[in-house]
Amino acid sequence: MYAVLATGGKQYRVQEGDVIYVEKLDAEVDSTVELTEVLAVANGEGIKVGAPVVEGAKVTAKVLAQGKQKKVIVFKYKAKKDYRRKNGHRQPYTKLVIEKIEA
């Protein structure tokens, strides 16, 4: 059984036991979160596709960690004008393990 869920503006195809990295969620480490924006659910018999979400479906996940990704360097310059700007960015994320898919 797998599900397609949306969180943080992205879509993820998950099964029970999968570990995924999503955009930062407001949750404590070792707590559980319910993701209710389930776009599709598939089991052995077939697939249910929502319009836009599957009614009554939810994915339960446990928060493993909160952290920041590797630094991305943003470097702007203008040729021949002695203009240089170096900036870094680290995007926060939440690491989840999928515990249960309910449809």
Curated annotation (Swiss-Prot):
<dbReference type="InterPro" id="IPR028909">
    <property type="entry name" value="bL21-like"/>
</dbReference>
<keyword id="KW-0694">RNA-binding</keyword>
<dbReference type="InterPro" id="IPR036164">
    <property type="entry name" value="bL21-like_sf"/>
</dbReference>
<dbReference type="InterPro" id="IPR001787">
    <property type="entry name" value="Ribosomal_bL21"/>
</dbReference>
<dbReference type="GO" id="GO:1990904">
    <property type="term" value="C:ribonucleoprotein complex"/>
</dbReference>
<comment type="similarity">
    <text>Belongs to the bacterial ribosomal protein bL21 family.</text>
</comment>
<comment type="function">
    <text>This protein binds to 23S rRNA in the presence of protein L20.</text>
</comment>
<dbReference type="GO" id="GO:0006412">
    <property type="term" value="P:translation"/>
</dbReference>
<dbReference type="InterPro" id="IPR018258">
    <property type="entry name" value="Ribosomal_bL21_CS"/>
</dbReference>
<keyword id="KW-0699">rRNA-binding</keyword>
<comment type="subunit">
    <text>Part of the 50S ribosomal subunit. Contacts protein L20.</text>
</comment>
<keyword id="KW-0687">Ribonucleoprotein</keyword>
<dbReference type="Pfam" id="PF00829">
    <property type="entry name" value="Ribosomal_L21p"/>
</dbReference>
<protein>
    <recommendedName>
        <fullName>Large ribosomal subunit protein bL21</fullName>
    </recommendedName>
</protein>
<keyword id="KW-0689">Ribosomal protein</keyword>
<dbReference type="GO" id="GO:0005737">
    <property type="term" value="C:cytoplasm"/>
</dbReference>
<dbReference type="GO" id="GO:0005840">
    <property type="term" value="C:ribosome"/>
</dbReference>
<dbReference type="GO" id="GO:0019843">
    <property type="term" value="F:rRNA binding"/>
</dbReference>
<dbReference type="GO" id="GO:0003735">
    <property type="term" value="F:structural constituent of ribosome"/>
</dbReference>
